[in-house]
Amino acid sequence: MNTEAEQQLLHHARNGNAEEVRKLLAAMARMEVVADIDCKGRSKSNLGWTPLHLACYFGHKQVVEDLLKAGAKVNMLNDMGDTPLHRAAFTGRKELVLLLLEYDADSTVVNGSGQTAKEATHDKEIRNMLEAVERTQQRKLEELLLGAAREGRTAEVSALLSRPNPPDVNCSDQLGNTPLHCAAYRAHKQCVLKLLRSGADPSLKNKNDQKPLDLAQGAEMKHILVGNKVVHKALKRYEGPLWKSSRFFGWKLFWVVLEHGVLSWYRKQPDAVHNSYRQGCKHLTQAVCTVKPTDSCLFSIRCFDDTVHCFRVPKNSVQQSREKWLEAIEEHSAYSTHYCSQDQVTDDEEEDVVSAMDLKESLARAQTCQQRLDREIYNFLKMIKECDVAKDMLPSFLQKADIVSEASRETCVALNDCLNLFTKQEGVRNFKLEQEQEKNKILSEALETLATEHHELERSLVEGSPPVSILSEEEFYDALSGSESEGSLTCLEAVTAHSFEENEVPGSSGKHRMSEGKDCGGGDALSNGIKKHRTSLPSPMFSRNDFSIWSILRKCIGMELSKITMPVIFNEPLSFLQRLTEYMEHTYLIHKASSLSDPVERMQCVAAFAVSAVASQWERTGKPFNPLLGETYELVRDDLGFRLISEQVSHHPPISAFHAEGLNNDFIFHGSIYPKLKFWGKSVEAEPKGTITLELLDHNEAYTWTNPTCCVHNIIVGKLWIEQYGNVEIINHKTGDKCVLNFKPCGLFGKELHKVEGYIQDKSKKKLCALYGKWTECLYSVDPATFDAYKKNDKKNTEEKKNSKQTSSSEESDEMPVPDSESVFIIPGSVLLWRIAPRPPNSAQMYNFTSFAMVLNEVDKEMESVIPKTDCRLRPDIRAMENGEIDLASEEKKRLEEKQRAARKNRSKSEEDWKTRWFHQGPNPYSGAQDWIYSGSYWDRNYFNLPDIY
């Protein structure tokens, strides 16, 4: 687009330079200038306004006419939600209002202040004019609705009733017939069902005192209208100002909205229009209204959970207003109760569902008639070919023609019967589908309401509860309260940095410590022959505060979560293959294990490595991009002493395989992960199916384990936070030693948040060592007897504190445990196995990445010439998101997904199976479980016949 031409168009439209506007429009028509006639201004004087808005506001009639003739959108909205008609009406320009109406301006559009053009004007004549136009437009829509109902055009009826300002579903013609009358006497079943679901009243009478039932044609139509069929009308939105009572703040005025069986209240009406800043809501299932005879303003609502909400109507038109509210609440309560309790199909509904046997018999009859028709036609044609036509043969031909004609009629009747059965079946299925969709919507809104209330209850319980153990931690309260996490993160960095200097892992070399948070520098400079890596991303992340995961998931209830396409704003600029690579951040633990001679000490290091593998997930609520089938990723880190290759080996189910090896041939680390997702209402759980295998080649040992379950909480309301829980069993297949780690769920008050505890046992289950810590911070080892004694004493102290609190509230402050400098209490005699490095200062702006994660998508020209074209670093949607180009990332993500679907369809047509390149399926050599094994030859760099996936 030509930005300069658009700025000129905006300037001339604002100043009324009609001649200049015509020149620009003519140049645009001749394609000499490419500009948008509906462009929006970006300067202070025209911000968010189109040329038509400006010309209407400043009263330049000729410019308005020229713009409309050139195709300017007459109902375009500016940033305040105003149409040009709003601006012309507001400034009292009658001629422009008439001109806009001639070009079909919509007078019913509501702006950001909740006003139509009629309500925005101060000119009485314009108001009367717009009211007359609205009545005319409304009557035209009503006539269209009546005509569509008479002719049985169900799609047109649905479209008219789905408009932002639909016609009255109970409008009438000159005879007093409503659309329901018209559809009923023409026996248009689908139209009748649609009208009833849209609120048509079957009790209304025409001028001859007839109801739709009196005009209905056929028993089936009468059956529907009598009401044997469960058809509930769609309720209209009802809203207005009400005073609401609060326990602490008394009476307060709100704008209250009733919609889809949910009562919501807002501070102001514009908030309700945009459904923002909702102050509260209540689901009306089984709700009951009560009034006090002595107070004509007051009424209360008792909800299904026995909570009572008191409201008071404004004093103007008290009785009438309260009656309307009570009627509306009763209707919405009945509507919500019906859809939340309707589980069984009624007998009448079952009768309408045509059985498979009926359909089969109908089709068989039609096929028999068709075969007879084919046979008679064949005989007729054969007779013509074999006989010379003579006068005496004409009667025979005529008789045969009659037989063929009769067979044709029978075939048509049979096929028509079959078609009618299928049509009836389709109608019933559509009706049931709409009912289930409505029920689904009601239940999802109920779930959101209950989750909000449950969240508030959790907050009140947590805020009112003191810590119950020295092992409890304060940052859990932040996770539930929704406060910012920067403070706790900074505190944690200070603690870990201080402790890291004092508790350095014995025997770890400087080379190994490079992975633990030291500044890696940036650019391509070399330090001691080791390449320096970048310390930040090209662009910070976009805020997700205005987006809700629940708004996406509520539309996908019942779907497999792995197949749901999420908006790119919820992603982080890494593929899941790159996220898997973060297992290798603390590779120094594997090197250390290889250097130790004691098998128990080796198991300690392996256990620490297994815990450290999930540490980077804390506060990483962004979803990695789903890898495309055939996508690969490689990482070579000379400074950390390993190289890794991974491949997406399956799309449904999504399976990622990886293989890493030490550069000094001291270890092999491999496995395959299938993240199985479950939606639990308030949380999403990811269970990483698949076996992880670590081979220490110098000791001829192999260890296998599975990762813990990851859960993202507060999907519906509150701040997202992550926890890991479940048992992880690490087995040494050579010695029989076993390490069982318990990743503890946090519980209600967060006492166990992030905790990891476990024991190393020999093959006779004798405890050799105890391990404890937090997967977000550190892991220690200690003598098992000492650990058991500490646990017993800690449990005793906890019970004493509870009893102390119950006997004397005055001693509560003295009994509160003093926070230690360590968020994990260190048992005397413990040995530090692993401590997480502090994240970089800019981590919060960089998707909460660790220093290791920052470099995973880094690419330079030298690397680009070496890696295969299937590598994640070359994936355009991830690259665009990393650069801050969200719109481009979304477009590229959609393009790649469509390309993958097209490739899958082509393989299906050609019956060609997908073949993985670098991995093959087979049993794990140690556990025997099905696994994906590295086939070799990747590092030979012979990348031929690779799929085109980007």
Curated annotation (Swiss-Prot):
GO terms for molecular function: lipid binding. GO terms for biological process: lipid transport. It holds the Pfam family Ank_2. The modification Phosphoserine is found at residue 499. Residues 1-237 are annotated as: Interaction with RAB7A. It comes from the Eukaryota. It is found in: Late endosome. A motif (FFAT) lies at residues 469-483. Ubiquitous. Keywords: ANK repeat, Coiled coil, Endosome, Lipid transport, Lipid-binding, Phosphoprotein, Repeat, Transport. Residues 235-334 form the PH domain. One of its GO terms (cellular component) is late endosome. Residues 430-463, 879-913 form a coiled coil. ANK repeats lie at residues 47-76, 80-109, 175-204. SMART domains: ANK (SM00248), PH (SM00233). Residues 502-530, 795-821 are annotated as: Disordered. Interacts (via FFAT motif) with VAPA and VAPB. Interacts with the GTP-bound form of RAB7A. Interacts with OAS1B. Interacts (via FFAT motif) with MOSPD2 (via MSP domain). Belongs to the OSBP family. Binds phospholipids; exhibits strong binding to phosphatidic acid and weak binding to phosphatidylinositol 3-phosphate. Stabilizes GTP-bound RAB7A on late endosomes/lysosomes and alters functional properties of late endocytic compartments via its interaction with RAB7A. Binds 25-hydroxycholesterol and cholesterol. The FFAT motif is required for interaction with MOSPD2. The FFAT motif is required for interaction with MOSPD2, VAPA and VAPB. This is Oxysterol-binding protein-related protein 1.
